[in-house]
Amino acid sequence: RRSLQDFFKEKCGVSIGKYIRQRKLSRSATLLKLTSQSVTDIAFRMGFDSVQSYSREFKKTFGVNPNNYRKADFWDLRNLRPPYWLDCDEHYQFEICQLTSKEIFGFQTSHQIATNDLPKKASPIKWKIIHETLRTWGENVYCLSSFKPDNTNDQVIAVSSFFGMEHNSVDGGKIPMPRVIKCGKYAKFHFVGHKEKYQQFSNTIYMCILPKLNIIRREGEDIEYFHMASVQKQQNNESIVDLYYYIPVL
């Protein structure tokens, strides 16, 4: 009779013990890049008995020590181990492209993600904002998102999103807040799907697809470009979105 360990290894490609070690290190890499927690706190939080043993294991996996990984102005996503429940067999249309700078007009939102919730599904509030904005503006909508350490709380990630369009007025009213989409090299993905699938989309990109492609993320904002057609599209009586997702890469 096959054991649970055999089933697990067949699904994930590694033993349960190795998976747990890799997940701890991958989780710690995310905390290094997206929070202000100290290396010491991260090491003990991940169950290591010392900072030295944590640093040794981290360097074996990622090629640099935790401090240098954090300080780098890019994010090397290679060797991240996705959680077992994430569908890494999902395929999305992909290409590398160059974007030119573009001014858009809209509004800003911000919220926090507790580190205990990582990896986090996309917020259902965001889904609601997207559909309401598409309907209200009657235009394709951009969403520029950044994820950074919170200066006042090392247990959360600060998330900022700017929703905008290419025109600075709607129904005769001016939209006062401008923002510039920065030019540069991006990995471009196409997504069409319903709410549940969308909520896991960025996790799949970051934890599965980009590491497989050996792509390194540079500094900058993630850009989502939602098509107006999303408002009319339905799938099994569920609203779906049609979007292009751009991630800044080296």
Kindly label every feature range from the protein language model.
Residues 20-25:
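Generic hydrophobic, amphipathic alpha-helix propensity
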